[in-house]
Curated annotation (Swiss-Prot):
Keywords (A to Z) from UniProt: Cytoplasm, Methyltransferase, rRNA processing, S-adenosyl-L-methionine, Transferase
PANTHER family: RIBOSOMAL RNA LARGE SUBUNIT METHYLTRANSFERASE G (PTHR47816:SF5), RIBOSOMAL RNA SMALL SUBUNIT METHYLTRANSFERASE C (PTHR47816)
Protein name listed in UniProt: Ribosomal RNA large subunit methyltransferase G
Catalytic activity: guanosine(1835) in 23S rRNA + S-adenosyl-L-methionine = N(2)-methylguanosine(1835) in 23S rRNA + S-adenosyl-L-homocysteine + H(+)
A single cellular component GO annotation: cytoplasm
Organism annotation: Erwinia tasmaniensis (strain DSM 17950 / CFBP 7177 / CIP 109463 / NCPPB 4357 / Et1/99)
Amino acid sequence: MSQLELSNRMLTLHRFPQMREESPLQAWDAADEYLLNHLDNLPVNGPTLIFNDTFGALACALAGEGVWSISDSWLNQQATRQNLALNQLDEGDVRLLDSLAPLPGAPARVLIKVPKTLALLEKQLRALRAVVTPETQIVAAGKAKEIHTSTLQLFEKILGPTTTSLAWKKARLIYATFTQPELAESEVISRWPLDGTPWQIHNHANVFARGGLDIGARFFMQHLPDDIDGEIVDLGCGNGVIGLMALRQNPLAQVHFLDESYMAVASSRMNVELNCPDDLARCEFRVNNALAGYPSDRLHAVLCNPPFHQQNAVTDHIAWQMFRDARRCLQYGGELRIVGNRHLDYYHKMKKLFGNCTTVATHQKFVILRSVKMP
């Protein structure tokens, strides 16, 4: 289903990357509907800031009303552009900002889709303190089961008095009034030492495993290729620890750090600059949709810990896209090496795509697989 019915119009909305027509996943959720229904009764005169609008449903519904859409996701921004075009809406009616850009001042209305990461929500609320006024309407929305006491306490601590709505279709709204409560400063960027190295790893708020190295990455770091004289991609780089290790083990290689998260790519760049400054000239950092736009038959190795979630939905289509892109971009003899949860059965997917797949190492929970592009 791709039609969202609103009180004053019908919107056609698709996920990005676009799913097969038979997929049950849609480009909006009940929290979007609840929030838009609520706004029907709230006239506003001034700019609207929208945070974490997953596929642009809110931006499309409110386009033309002085809308700014702020997201950490390059894919979400592309989805917004796609859905504006699908609905014959002018892209200029919605101004897109990444998660690290300064916010416009004195918004009349702030709409927040509650993110999965509490650290990202805190970063966004702290940034809002500098621009909202007591007259700003502040409304957040999310799944009722994901709005916890800690979520409400965060709004209250940073912005001011906070209340919630009744649940509707398992969604809930949060209402906050800005009263500028006293607030201690907080570190925006977390940092921790990487065992076995002299490095300090720095993470922006929306980066996976913000407080320390996750088990899968730790396992993967022990089984990376070495002595490659060519181009290596850390695909879905996160904070860049895999790419950092690839730099160390492949002193003649060029390493590309790619992710669809602006904060991930910024974290990767920071970690190279602070830990391996002499290697910075061998690096490229890009916010991107997998390997879209990269030339074919060029890369020597692609290293990847593919995600199996997009927002709150479990899906393998992003992993499939990464694998297909890797096969296209690898030169003959180049390899795709991944780490993944054992239950995801990437072995058969990679063997089907490449014609070969070998197990490099196994762990109680994870497996490392390698496929080589053959003529």
